[in-house]
Amino acid sequence: DQPRSRGLGDVYKRQLLIYYSASGNWTPYYCVGLLTADANSDLLNPNSWKKSLEPVFKQAPENHVYGPGSLCFIPSPDKKEWYILYHARNALRDMFVLDGRTTRIQKIEWDENGIPILGIPQKESTLLQKPSGTPTSDRN
């Protein structure tokens, strides 16, 4: 058995995943949903698709994160780790003002079926470890 890294390419061999943002991004209810379909199904048939019953990534008031959405997946330099990049707000005030959203990144994990586990949006002040395979610099 050769060790292998899990990536989004592995996911697409078995099923297609479409992450989408829902609700208005000026509301605390802006969130991410998920559509899935078997990769061998008739993708033009609406019955081939399953929609998550609940958002798969949503506000986390305990971490002062409101309206997370518009995520994309980013691999570490050596593709052994994966991250999501998204934007959100840290306060409920001024929700209807379009500025005030900040860009965030956090590491994700994978379940036994190769589906990304997005986790809970972290506090804006959460520190991350350097991604796996990050080159070191000779500069001081």
Residue ranges and their predicted role:
Residues 13-16, 21-63, 77-82, 87-140:
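Beta-rich carbohydrate-recognition and catalytic domains
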Residues 65-67:
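Repeat-based blade/solenoid architectures
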Residues 1-8, 12:
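Single conserved hydrophobic/aromatic residue that forms the stacking wall/gate
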Residues 1, 70, 87:
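Histidine-centered active-site/metal-ligand motif
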Residues 6, 69-72:
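Beta-propeller and closely related beta-sheet repeat lectin domains
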